[in-house]
Amino acid sequence: MKIIEIEPIVLHVPYEDRIRKQYHHFNMTEQVTVYKFYTDTGLIGIGENVGPPFDSELLDSYLGTSPFDHVMGSGRFNLDIACYDLMGKHLGLPAWKLMGQQVRHWVAMGWWMPCMSPENTAAEVQVAVERGYRGLKCKARAFYDVIEQSHAIQEVAPPDFRVEYDFNGSLINVEKALPILRELEKIPVVKGVEEPIFAYDIEGWRRLHQEIRIPFYLH
């Protein structure tokens, strides 16, 4: 099985107006590109990235190769997704079987929001609850105090609601992260933290595991 053609399909997925206004401090895009990987066997694999299509040189590097050439590869994961899709279809297996043991049988769905003022954060949580969501992931940045945001959420969220923060490494290191994370773990609605410090700081992650109760994980 060889990849013979890659078709980029550019989509425009707009934010709701209130989110767009709150997201001015991020250089984000409403453009999403879906890739269809065609093969000489007729199978089609699907990949995706946020933003415009990758350049033709990168896409061309996949042409003429087998999807199996990209197992645990060093290419763009957005494109390797399509290769795993193809491998799973070719073998008649779910793609996770090519990656290791199954961890869970389901994946939680949640609301998403950029970092906002505590007042707007509370209002956004109420929108999420009204639409049936019981959890959300919020970008956490220095624009607003994440502790104040969390207290605002705690005041309006139903008892079973959960919030997880995505810092994208913005707490930098353990010394800066620990005081903030220790305050967050006192707030019941906070259930998880994504990449509080830089991913390569192995010793820092080990120390967080020793000292922090809140679950945390890589981006």
Where are the model-predicted features located?
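Structured beta-strand/loop patches that form or line metal/cofactor-binding pockets in enzymes
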Residues: 1-45, 50
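Metal- or metallocofactor-binding catalytic centers and their adjacent structured scaffolds
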Residues: 5-6, 35-94
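Glycine-rich, aromatic-flanked loop segments that form ligand/cofactor-binding clefts
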Residues: 81-116
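Active-site mouth loops of central-metabolism enzymes
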Residues: 105-120, 139-140, 168-174, 217-219
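Short, acidic/polar
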Residues: 116-128, 174-182
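A structural motif
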Residues: 133-135, 189-190
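Catalytic core of soluble alpha/beta enzymes
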Residues: 145-219
